[in-house]
């Protein structure tokens, strides 16, 4: 999800596990990958891209460009998955891409809640500077929860947010949520990355929520 041509790594960050994708497709009348024959290249899919609500840090080289992150098109998503040898199918893209976009929008809304009260309104609000996928690297919290018997997240992202010039790191764990009426869901655990400032943000939020509940 970038305002210019996506590189291969950034194109392929889709926080949707195969089992969630398959169940979602089934609930929406789609076919499982095993039921669809391989489609030879080239595959023509929609190239339209959706503009996100996520503000982008604008640099001098970006002057005049869109100041919001832009999601990949169905064609870009398919090509990226093909390069990763994930055996994608064109029919899946119309479902996978909206899920990908919706999950990222939800993650940003959660970050905005964390950012409340930290002064970013004086410069127009926080902006997303960059993001990275770390699917193979468990966060300390996810590791502890797994030791206690909980499932591991199926993906992890690290987002770097610019708050009026201050870099604030966030971590996002993606979990399979419960299936409701045959439709699977995804649970996001969004929080500041563990650091001195991140720990202070967590304490600040917990304190506010605690006293807010007690005052009711």
From Swiss-Prot:
<dbReference type="GO" id="GO:0004408">
    <property type="term" value="F:holocytochrome-c synthase activity"/>
</dbReference>
<keyword id="KW-0349">Heme</keyword>
<keyword id="KW-0479">Metal-binding</keyword>
<dbReference type="GO" id="GO:0005758">
    <property type="term" value="C:mitochondrial intermembrane space"/>
</dbReference>
<keyword id="KW-0456">Lyase</keyword>
<keyword id="KW-0472">Membrane</keyword>
<keyword id="KW-0999">Mitochondrion inner membrane</keyword>
<comment type="function">
    <text>Lyase that catalyzes the covalent linking of the heme group to the cytochrome C1 apoprotein to produce the mature functional cytochrome.</text>
</comment>
<feature type="region of interest" description="Disordered">
    <location>
        <begin position="1"/>
        <end position="46"/>
    </location>
</feature>
<keyword id="KW-0496">Mitochondrion</keyword>
<protein>
    <recommendedName>
        <fullName>Putative holocytochrome-c1 synthase</fullName>
        <ecNumber>4.4.1.17</ecNumber>
    </recommendedName>
</protein>
<comment type="similarity">
    <text>Belongs to the cytochrome c-type heme lyase family.</text>
</comment>
<dbReference type="GO" id="GO:1903607">
    <property type="term" value="P:cytochrome c biosynthetic process"/>
</dbReference>
<dbReference type="GO" id="GO:0005743">
    <property type="term" value="C:mitochondrial inner membrane"/>
</dbReference>
<keyword id="KW-0408">Iron</keyword>
<dbReference type="GO" id="GO:0005739">
    <property type="term" value="C:mitochondrion"/>
</dbReference>
<dbReference type="Pfam" id="PF01265">
    <property type="entry name" value="Cyto_heme_lyase"/>
</dbReference>
<dbReference type="InterPro" id="IPR000511">
    <property type="entry name" value="Holocyt_c/c1_synthase"/>
</dbReference>
<dbReference type="GO" id="GO:0046872">
    <property type="term" value="F:metal ion binding"/>
</dbReference>
